[in-house]
């Protein structure tokens, strides 16, 4: 339990550090390198378009990250007549998390990167957080590849160029042909790629569970759920204003029906 509580502190700090490093690289390396193009128009310069897109992806990722933490999915009134820490909740979808020390309604899982449980109130924000984090990381990787290609005069036309970049760069770094800042960007390329793929896979997995009207906790416990149309399951999580939620981080408006069903 001590290791889990320690991980609950280290994982959010790791995420915030990666976010800070990404912002620094974007502002002080990638954007200045795009401004050096004299043929680009001022109104639609690559630096302006890149900065606007990156800020949009980052604002949605960090905004939904904050909302996942603020929208605590606990429902301490779900267990009536006994202490939530000693008596299991009557509803099969409620769960007491020992790491959070709280009862979660429609518990899905505990996310260590947010330090919070994922349930009915913050499920939509969590899915959007995974989506925009994946897009921001993959887009940062593309921008980093363009920067490395221009600085080191490396062509990525060959399909295996990205796979052989790291071992080649390590040997060149120790020989003095690659600077420390350039080597750091190359390492970040692989880190962005790994985080982007992981978040994309997790987002797709959560969407499949939402379409089936299930949570990961119910799947692990083998709890049977009532079959419903997939459109209704999506609306229960994302609400009627789902398009607005895709563009602007906002509170979950689709969890009221799920709350009433589990009480």
From Swiss-Prot:
Its main location: endoplasmic reticulum. GO terms for cellular component: endoplasmic reticulum; endoplasmic reticulum membrane; Golgi apparatus; Golgi membrane; plasma membrane. Signal peptide: none annotated. The active site is at residue 111. Keywords: Acyltransferase, Endoplasmic reticulum, Golgi apparatus, Lipoprotein, Membrane, Palmitate, Transferase, Transmembrane, Transmembrane helix. The chain crosses the membrane at residues 10-30, 49-69, 126-146, 147-167, 183-203. Its EC number is 2.3.1.225. The keyword Phosphoprotein does not apply. Residues 31-48, 204-263 are lumenal. The keyword Transit peptide does not apply. It is an enzyme of class 2 (transferase). It is found in: Endoplasmic reticulum membrane; Golgi apparatus membrane. Widely expressed. Residues 1-9, 70-125, 168-182 are cytoplasmic. Residues 92-131 form the DHHC domain. The DHHC domain is required for palmitoyltransferase activity. Belongs to the DHHC palmitoyltransferase family. This is Palmitoyltransferase ZDHHC22. It comes from Homo sapiens (Human).
């Amino acid at each position: 339990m001590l290791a889990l509580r320690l991980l609950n502190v280290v994982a959010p700090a790791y995420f915030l550090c990666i976010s800070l490093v990404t912002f620094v690289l974007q502002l002080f390396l990638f954007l200045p390198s795009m401004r050096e193009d004299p043929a680009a128009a001022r109104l639609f310069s690559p630096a302006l378009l890149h900065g606007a897109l990156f800020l949009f992806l980052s604002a949605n990722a960090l905004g939904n990250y904050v909302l996942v933490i603020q929208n605590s999915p606990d429902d301490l009134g779900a267990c009536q007549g006994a202490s939530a820490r000693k008596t299991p909740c009557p509803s099969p979808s409620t769960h007491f998390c020992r790491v959070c020390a709280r009862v979660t309604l429609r518990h899905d899982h505990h996310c260590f990167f947010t330090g919070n449980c994922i349930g009915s109130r913050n499920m939509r924000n969590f899915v959007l957080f995974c989506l925009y984090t994946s897009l921001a990381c993959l887009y940062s990787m593309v921008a980093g590849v363009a920067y490395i290609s221009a600085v080191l005069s490396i062509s990525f036309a060959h399909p295996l160029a990205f796979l052989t970049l790291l071992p080649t760069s390590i040997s060149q770094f120790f020989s003095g042909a690659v600077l420390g800042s350039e080597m750091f960007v190359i390492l970040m390329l692989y880190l962005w790629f790994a985080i982007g793929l992981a978040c994309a896979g997790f987002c797709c997995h959560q969407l499949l569970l939402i379409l089936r009207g299930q949570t990961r906790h119910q799947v692990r416990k083998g709890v049977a759920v009532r079959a419903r149309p997939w459109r209704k399951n999506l609306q229960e999580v994302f609400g009627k204003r789902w398009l607005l939620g895709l563009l602007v981080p906002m509170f979950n408006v689709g969890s009221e029906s799920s709350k009433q069903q589990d009480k």
